[in-house]
């Protein structure tokens, strides 16, 4: 399989899982909302399988395709922790995360999600440019 098919297959599976979660459970596939409900003692019977699938999905992929991408993170642990906290803060401020707004929200033609996703993308490009990623 060509390396270009992996992102296409991933997008198809993301879309399929989003539609299935909405149709079968009436829930939006926003990871921050799902994890938030779990941490607040929500209904684990509906949310745990989705989170487990997020963790096991890449492992199943690596077994099936005999490929597991190597990831190198050059940042220090304090930087990673601060970045994670900032992402969490931004998620709360925007009433959702990239998966909730970018995948489920745009698919539902939500104006709030379209604006939020545009801001996510612009902020990401600005940050990458500021950090010198494009040099």
UniProtKB/Swiss-Prot annotation:
Protein name, UniProt field: Probable transporter XF_0766
InterPro entries, alphabetized: Sulf_transp_TsuA/YedE
Induction section of the entry: Repressed by BigR.
Segments passing through the bilayer: 4-24, 45-65, 71-91, 114-134
UniProt membrane topology term: Multi-pass membrane protein
Miscellaneous field: Part of an operon that comprises bigR, blh, XF_0764 and XF_0765.
Pfam hit, one: Sulf_transp
Location relative to the cell: Cell inner membrane
A single Gene Ontology CC term: plasma membrane
Keyword Cell inner membrane appears in the UniProt entry: yes
